Each structure stands twice: as C-alpha cells, then as structure tokens.
Amino acid sequence: MPAKKKEVRSKLEYIWLDGYKPTQNMRSKTKVIANFSGKLKDCPMWSFDGSSTRQAEGGSSDCLLKPVALYPDPVRENGYIVMTEVMNPDGSPHESNARAKIDDDDNDYWFGFEQEYFIMDSKTQLPLGFPVGGYPGPQ
C-alpha cells in the first residue's frame, strides 16, 4: 500500500476595511485551506456578515471578500495575509470599497504600509539612547 501524502494546512488571514465613518477600521478573519498553492489565483472569494461592520442592513447582510494581493505571513507557519476588496453579493464593488474607484491605468497613486520598531534598553526600559528622566514622558 503506498504511503499516504501528508496534508499541509495553510492559514489565510483575509483583511478588509469596514464601513465605519469617518475612519474605517481593519477587519480580518482566518480561513484554513488544505494543500494551498501559495498563489493568489487559488485564494477563494469569501463572504462575511456586513451588518456587523456597517456594510449592510440586517435583512440582506452578505458581503463578499475578493482577494487582490497575497503575502507570506511573517508570524505564522504556513500562513498568508490576503488583502481583499469588499464586494456586493452581485459582484459589484461595495460603496465602502474606495480601492475599486482607483483607475488601474493611472500610475500616479502609490500606497504603502509602515511598521515602526524600537530597540529597548533592558536596564532602563526606555528606547535605546533615551535619557533617564528625560522627555517626552510616558504616554
């Protein structure tokens, strides 16, 4: 009897912007997929309850998450971060989906994420080089 191939399970963290105003919040949920290829084309569309994110009324609250970018998750083994756009059930862009309004042929738009890090002094518990008793004070 041939050896059974071990199933590899991947965690896909779907991320989207909710419908809160004036400032949208990031939302996410995780889908576990067996033997995922690691390619964007193999990320399935997924739905969520838009009434809890101010993107739909209670009676007809399904919204769709359309994967548009895929990145390896630096924190989780076999993990991926799936950036998505919010779509209506008919596949049209949701009104909160400002990304869909960007003209793909216009190369003047640049977007990026910024992550800040601090190296802490283990003795003073302050950022390295910060004067003890100096300013600014704790926030």
Residue ranges of each PLM-predicted region?
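Glycine-rich, acidic/polar active-site loops that bind/position phosphate-bearing ligands
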Residues: M1-Q139
